[in-house]
Every structure is written in structure tokens, then in C-alpha cells.
């Protein structure tokens, strides 16, 4: 490993990358000037630098209760109308569903999470395909399903899609990739002498789906809404009533939030820098009490397709410290919820319990065992199982 931290030496190290690694980085939209600039920023006191980089400026305040709408309740006249509006949009080809599938199940043996069995002998990927098949059958047309993969998951997922004979409207696109640096800003090399690559966070989705051409083609064909969620949150399925509510709203992005329970940590909606936006706790002003906000982000978003395609978005790159081969390293990541800073956002509180639950994430084997009955009940109630 080199300790030189000047941009010139990092640039020279990047020049020396193998052709194979360069090709992989290029395919994943690697931004060389950005990494060189970020490396050069690794100076001064670490805590001060991270506070300056990560925390929003100015004051923050909790949203009012009127700014968090409840999800449409089943059985009401209003919900029936919204459901009809949403179903009509799906039948007209106006919806695409995106699943973020770049993660490895590090607490489940380090395998590709999409290929982990979730319930009833079916993997997360198989359940997402089954969900899409049911939705497409009801709509009377294929509903586009796009899977954002990472360098680690792309090939296994594409092989699984081939093996499962996934329909042509199921596509994959590759999220971004970058290289880890030393704490001083030099290119980190592992015990094998090779650079250490990493995925750069789910905030990559916007640039990645633009780069893929899928979004542009979808918009040209009349697509209007992109629904985005995590692979492992099987509760986050397409709800026509929520879609209808978003269609009727003036917002460009709708965020699904749910009530906090003990132990929950995640981004929360707050007023900051002139926007009601989702911020992780490390981004909040030091004097802001996160407990004053009783809901948090489920990482499920509905976004206007044209805004997702064309809106100018200035991304923050967040400094994350990791350890590789026993050495401290720095990697830079983006967060998808920054959409709520760039686009006008609205928030909908969704249930997290019962067959209507929309927040059922799975992070480890114990949670999978605990959640399996809830997942099964939710999917059965929606006609997926």
C-alpha cells in the first residue's frame, strides 16, 4: 500500500489498473475524477471533516402530523376509487417495478441474497418473479420488473433468471462500482496487492437506470411511475390504491414510512434546508432529537418516471469507514433517499403488522425464521402464494 495522498499519485495508481478491472469499472459507470477529488478531500481532523461533509446545514424540525398521510384503508369508497385509478395505470403500461438486488447476505453465509430461500421453498428472487407474474396477469400485460444488481450479484442473478425462464420484461441493470482508499486518500491494495472494489450504495440507482437505457425506453413508451424497493422487503408489493394516491398527488416522489418501534434505526423525514426530506441520523444537526419523529423510511419509493430520468440531482458522497484484511479503509457511498431533497416529496404511513404489512425486511437467519409466517401471510393475502 502507498501512503502518498496527493491526487497525482492516486491518478497514477488508477492509470496502472489492469485492463480487466478497468473494463468492469467502466461498465459500472466508474467516475474517476470524482474519486480523485474525494481522495483529495481526506485531510484534516476526521471527525470535523465528516461532520462538515455529512450533516445538513441550519436547523431541522419534525414534520407535522398532517404531512404524513395514512395509507388508503381497505374497504372505503375512497380506497376503491384510488385502487381503480392505480389498476388502470398499470393496465395502461404506466408502471415499472424496480428491486434493489445488489446485496450479499453477509449474515447468511455470504451468499447472494436474492438466491436465499425466504419461505415455502422459494427464494427472494423467485417470490419477486411470482409477484410480478400475478401482477402482470391481473393487468393483462407484462409489467416491467427491473433488478438492480452489483458486481457481486449480477452474474448469479442473471444465471438464475435464465434457469427460472424469467420472461423478457424482467431485466437487470448494474449499479455503480468504485475503489476503496486508505484513510490518507491513496488507492488501497489488499493482501493480494490488488485494489479493493465496492458497490457505491443504493443511491446509484438513478444514474444506473439512466445508463441502462431501460428508463428512457419506458418513458418513450408512455411509462409514468417507477416503484422502487429492497429485494428483502417482501411486504413492499404493488398496491394499486397507493399508486392511485401518488398519481393524484402533485409530488414527484412518494416515500413509504412506518411507525417506529423499539430498536428501529433509519432515515426519518425532517424539514431541513428548505425541504421535507429523509435524513439518516448521522446527517441530522447535533442538537436535533430524532425521537421527535415517530416514523422512519422503509426505503420504498414511488417516483415520476420522467423526473427520475431527467431531473438534475446533486448527490452527496458519504465517507464510510470499513476494514479490509485488517486495515482501515474509506469508501464513498450515495443514499437513494436524497431524491427527497432534489424532488418534491410526499409521505405515506404504511402498516408493518398483519397481512397488510408493507415493511418486512430480513437481515439475518433469525429474522428470516421470525418473519417467515408474516411474509407468507402477507403474500397469501395478496394472491401471490
Where are the regions a protein language model picked out?
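Residue-level detector of flexible, active-site-proximal loop/helix-junction positions
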Residues: 122, 177-179, 260, 354
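A general secondary-structure junction signal
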Residues: 149, 174-176, 349-351
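Catalytic core of tubulin tyrosine ligase-like
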Residues: 218-230, 235-239, 244-385
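Cofactor-binding loop segments of dinucleotide-utilizing enzymes, especially the Rossmann-like FAD-
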Residues: 102, 150, 175, 231, ...
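Internal metal/ion-chelating core segments
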Residues: 161, 167-252
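N-terminal glycine-rich phosphate-binding loop and ensuing alpha1 helix
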Residues: 3-171, 179, 188-198, 202-206, ...
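Solvent-exposed, flexible loop/coil residues
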Residues: 112, 119-122, 183, 213, ...
Amino acid at each position: 500500500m502507498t501512503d502518498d495522498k496527493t491526487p497525482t499519485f492516486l491518478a497514477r495508481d488508477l492509470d496502472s489498473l489492469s485492463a480487466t478491472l478497468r473494463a468492469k469499472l467502466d461498465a459500472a459507470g466508474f467516475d474517476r475524477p470524482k474519486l480523485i477529488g474525494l481522495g483529495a478531500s481526506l485531510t484534516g481532523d476526521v471527525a470535523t471533516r465528516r461532520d462538515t461533509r455529512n450533516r445538513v446545514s441550519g436547523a431541522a424540525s419534525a414534520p407535522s402530523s398532517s404531512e404524513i398521510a395514512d395509507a388508503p384503508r381497505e374497504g372505503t369508497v375512497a380506497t376503491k376509487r384510488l385502487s381503480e385509478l392505480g389498476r388502470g395505470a398499470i393496465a395502461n403500461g404506466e408502471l415499472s417495478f424496480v428491486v434493489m438486488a445488489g446485496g450479499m447476505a453477509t449474515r447468511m453465509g455470504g451468499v447472494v441474497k436474492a438466491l436465499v430461500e425466504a419461505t415455502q421453498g422459494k427464494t427472494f428472487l423467485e417470490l419477486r418473479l411470482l409477484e410480478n407474474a400475478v401482477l402482470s396477469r391481473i393487468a393483462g400485460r407484462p409489467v416491467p420488473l427491473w433488478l438492480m444488481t452489483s458486481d457481486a450479484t449480477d452474474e448469479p442473478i442473471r444465471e438464475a433468471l435464465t434457469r427460472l425462464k424469467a420472461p423478457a420484461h424482467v431485466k437487470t441493470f448494474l449499479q455503480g462500482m468504485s475503489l476503496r482508499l486508505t484513510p490518507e486518500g491513496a488507492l488501497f491494495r489488499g493482501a493480494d496487492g490488488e485494489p479493493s472494489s465496492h458497490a457505491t450504495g443504493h443511491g446509484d440507482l438513478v444514474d444506473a437506470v439512466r445508463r441502462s437505457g431501460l428508463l428512457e425506453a419506458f418513458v418513450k413508451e408512455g411509462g409514468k411511475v417507477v416503484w422502487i424497493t429492497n429485494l428483502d422487503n417482501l411486504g413492499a408489493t404493488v398496491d394499486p390504491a397507493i399508486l392511485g394516491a401518488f398519481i393524484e398527488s402533485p409530488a414527484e416522489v412518494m416515500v413509504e414510512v412506518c411507525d417506529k418501534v423499539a430498536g428501529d434505526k433509519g432515515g426519518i423525514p425532517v424539514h431541513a434546508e428548505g425541504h421535507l426530506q429523509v435524513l439518516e441520523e448521522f446527517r441530522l444537526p447535533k442538537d436535533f432529537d430524532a425521537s421527535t419523529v415517530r416514523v422512519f423510511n422503509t426505503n420504498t419509493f414511488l417516483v415520476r418516471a420522467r423526473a427520475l430520468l431527467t431531473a438534475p440531482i446533486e448527490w452527496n458522497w458519504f465517507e464510510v469507514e470499513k476494514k479490509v484484511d485488517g486495515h482501515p479503509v474509506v469508501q464513498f457511498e450515495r443514499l437513494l433517499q436524497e431524491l427527497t431533497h432534489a424532488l418534491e416529496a410526499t409521505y405515506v404511513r404504511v402498516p408493518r403488522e398483519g397481512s397488510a404489512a408493507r415493511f418486512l425486511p430480513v437481515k439475518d437467519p433469525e429474522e428470516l425464521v421470525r418473519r417467515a409466517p408474516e411474509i407468507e401471510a402477507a403474500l397469501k393475502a395478496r394472491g401471490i402464494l
